[in-house]
Amino acid sequence: WIVGKILPSFDQKQFGAIKGRSTTHALIDMLHTWHSAQDQQKLARILFVDFAKAFDRVDHSIVISKLIAFGLPGSVVKWFASFLANRQQRVKIGCAFSNWLQLNGSMPQGSWLGPLSFIILIDDLKLSCLTHKFVDDTTVTEILSRRQQSSMQQYYNELVDWTDSNLMRINDSKTKEMIIGSDAAIVAIPPLLSSGSDQIERVDRFKLLGITISRDLKWSDHIDIICSKASSRIHFLKQLKRSGVPTADLLHYYVSVIRPTLEYACPVWHSSITSEQSDT
């Protein structure tokens, strides 16, 4: 009911924890943008943002204030607040326990309301460029003509301002950037600096929502990875068969373990692979 009430107000580039939207939808939308830039002889400068301990740093009072801003009834806001309130934790070492500590932040794990709380928190993260979100996975894209000066540093600074206002933090060591385009044009683009003045690492490939994205937007790396995973699991399947495991159980193992490895998000990449890769 809560999602139905506030869904029309959600950022349309948020794909996580919402019925009818998935990692596949998010990936297709992003890759369409990057392929379009490539087709137009433009550059796509992409920032893959990692929030440090994203769910653990969520401040309950900020989430509640944003729920109120969505215009939800007071009774619903109080119910949601009661879900977050009065949570405690303590540490056990051997037979010794620490004192209980009241939690004013962090999202409960294993509950659907946890991811929902995070997308409510991050909904107003709106930069001056295209931003895709899948719960706490955030991808920032800037499209550039070959002679255009990049503004990604400005967008990164906007992101830092948002994290400061919402008591979040960017993990600069895990945040990466990738530029799709010609090598000559990429070399001319200055490095992106973190808030600590360190360079954000520029990579040629990145695992995004379970898919390996390469700078040339080809799928050799991704296919090699999934074939390697599937091969080891098929080897284990053969061992199970030699051990006399019933056929029904072997089939269940294939359907639940091997097939998802090969088919995950296949609408994103399968139509772009070569016939040789398909035969692999």
Language model regions located:
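Inter-domain linker/hinge segments that demarcate the starts of reverse transcriptase
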Residues: 1-3, 26-37, 149-166, 231
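Short, conserved micro-motifs composed of acidic
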Residues: 95, 154, 161, 169-204
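Catalytic palm subdomain of template-directed nucleic-acid polymerases
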Residues: 54-70, 127, 138-164
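Conserved pre-catalytic core of RNA-dependent polymerases
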Residues: 1-107, 142
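Conserved, non-catalytic sequence blocks in retroelement Pol enzymes and Pol-derived host proteins
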Residues: 15-24, 36-41, 52-56, 69-75, ...
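Short, residue-level hotspots on alpha-helical faces of the histone-fold
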Residues: 4, 82, 119-123, 256-260, ...
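Basic, alpha-helical interaction scaffolds
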Residues: 132, 197-269
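Catalytic palm active-site di-aspartate
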Residues: 14-18, 45-54, 80, 106-114, ...
